[in-house]
Amino acid sequence: MARFFRRRKFCRFTAEGVKEIDYKDLDTLKGYITETGKIVPSRITGTKARYQRQLATAIKRARYLALLPYTDGHDH
């Protein structure tokens, strides 16, 4: 039986020594939302709980300021 080794998940923010996640850093935030606009959970990304909370707040602020979409385009 073949064994599959999953890559070890690690927190990018801890590795880079980030203190605060900025809502204006759209390139980083876009990596943590799905194509439908949902926030990707930390069990998938490997982000630590502290940074996941900051990430969620930053994404919500960016959405409120229309920097990020709430959902996808819905083009049928």
Swiss-Prot record:
GO terms for molecular function: small ribosomal subunit rRNA binding; structural constituent of ribosome. GO terms for biological process: translation. The keyword Ribonucleoprotein applies. Part of the 30S ribosomal subunit. Forms a tight heterodimer with protein bS6. The keyword rRNA-binding applies. Pfam families: Ribosomal_S18. GO terms for cellular component: cytosolic small ribosomal subunit. The gene is rpsR. This is Small ribosomal subunit protein bS18. Belongs to the bacterial ribosomal protein bS18 family. InterPro entries: Ribosomal_bS18, Ribosomal_bS18_CS, Ribosomal_bS18_sf.
